């Protein structure tokens, strides 16, 4: 852990945004594994033009990682916007996800784009997101940040591995956007156990990024 603190303090350059593999046509319930995508809220709050729909940027909340989504994946690519006979979530369903996702609008969008491909009902999909988050321990180090730091993807990966011994570097992808940490994406089996990401998903940010401190 001492080495982790030293690495977080290193002044380095900013990183470019990460590109992603392509989406594919899909059928609900037909996929190979999940990606749990965790967004670093301070980066989003810094870059978003309008944050009124999210409480993650409220001053004094010191929000760190929030859930972006739980995404069905193929071993190559991923499905999205799958046809489904499942009804859409109610407003109450999406409001109940605000504590994890920061906004009901994001919960709705994630259901529409990714949840429909899970083959689950909306309420069960949201329950699955909650279950997935209980499987991952957020490193305490990041919640204690009191200043912006510059670091590389392996430092973040090592912190998650130290807090979650079942994880490996091949099971974590760290992305950046606009020179800031964007997301940590963790690959899970369909029953939410850690696994390696497929090769096309292992695309870490290759340069140094800034990790803005929670406010």
Describe the role of every protein-language-model region:
Residues 23-47:
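N-terminal module-boundary/linker segments of secreted carbohydrate-active enzymes
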Residues 35-39, 49-215:
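Domain-level detector of nuclease and nuclease-like folds
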Residues 1-4:
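Positively charged n-region of N-terminal signal peptides that target proteins for export
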Residues 7-17:
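Bacterial N-terminal signal peptides
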Residues 19-21:
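C-terminal region of N-terminal signal peptides and the immediate post-cleavage residues
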């Amino acid at each position: 852990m001492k080495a982790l603190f030293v690495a977080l303090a290193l002044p380095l350059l900013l990183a470019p945004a990460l590109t992603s593999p392509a989406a594919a046509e899909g059928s609900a319930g037909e996929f190979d594994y999940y990606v749990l995508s965790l967004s670093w809220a301070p980066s989003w709050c810094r870059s978003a033009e309008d944050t009124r729909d999210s409480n993650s940027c409220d001053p004094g909340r010191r929000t760190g990682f929030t859930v972006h989504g739980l995404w069905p994946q193929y071993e190559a690519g991923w499905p999205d916007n799958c046809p489904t006979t499942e009804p859409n979530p109610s407003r109450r369903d999406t409001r109940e996800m605000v504590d994890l996702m920061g906004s009901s609008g994001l919960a709705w969008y994630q259901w529409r784009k990714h949840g429909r491909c899970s083959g689950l009902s909306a309420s069960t999909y949201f329950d699955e997101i909650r279950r997935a988050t209980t499987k991952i321990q957020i490193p305490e180090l990041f919640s204690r940040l009191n200043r912006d730091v510059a670091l590389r993807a392996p430092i973040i990966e090592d912190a998650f591995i130290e807090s979650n011994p079942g994880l490996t570097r091949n099971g974590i992808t760290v992305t950046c956007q606009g020179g800031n940490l964007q997301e940590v994406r963790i690959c899970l089996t369909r029953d939410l156990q850690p696994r390696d990401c497929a090769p096309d998903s292992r695309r870490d940010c290759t340069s140094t990024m800034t990790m803005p401190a929670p406010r």
